[in-house]
Amino acid sequence: MIQVYKYDENFMFVEPLVVTEIDEKGDYIFPDNCTSVPLPDSPSYYLPRFDLSKQVWIETASQEYIDSLSPPPEEPSDVELLGQSLAEARILILKQNRIILNLQNEVKNLKDGTTA
């Protein structure tokens, strides 16, 4: 048993097929418009076409077509936006608290320095 790859009249990939039929020499009998050349795994192709003369699969999809297959990024929900605002506010408060603590320490050091 062997897997082959069927292509149409334009050499565009159609489907994988499993071949089990063997001739008298022990060779597998491929259906018409099939090849044993596997499609690449990485990167996989979006619109593979078989180049019969070179015996390789090539990508025919444009970058625009490939990009169109990806869904657009989702807009953040109101809850996500609120969460982001809350996180930013907490960070700001922590920074302000650190500044206040540093200023308090400076004041204390100045007082200790003048009374000592």
UniProtKB/Swiss-Prot annotation:
Superkingdom per UniProt: Bacteria
Stated name of the protein: SPbeta prophage-derived uncharacterized protein YomQ
Native species: Bacillus subtilis (strain 168)
Taxonomic placement: Bacteria, Bacillati, Bacillota, Bacilli, Bacillales
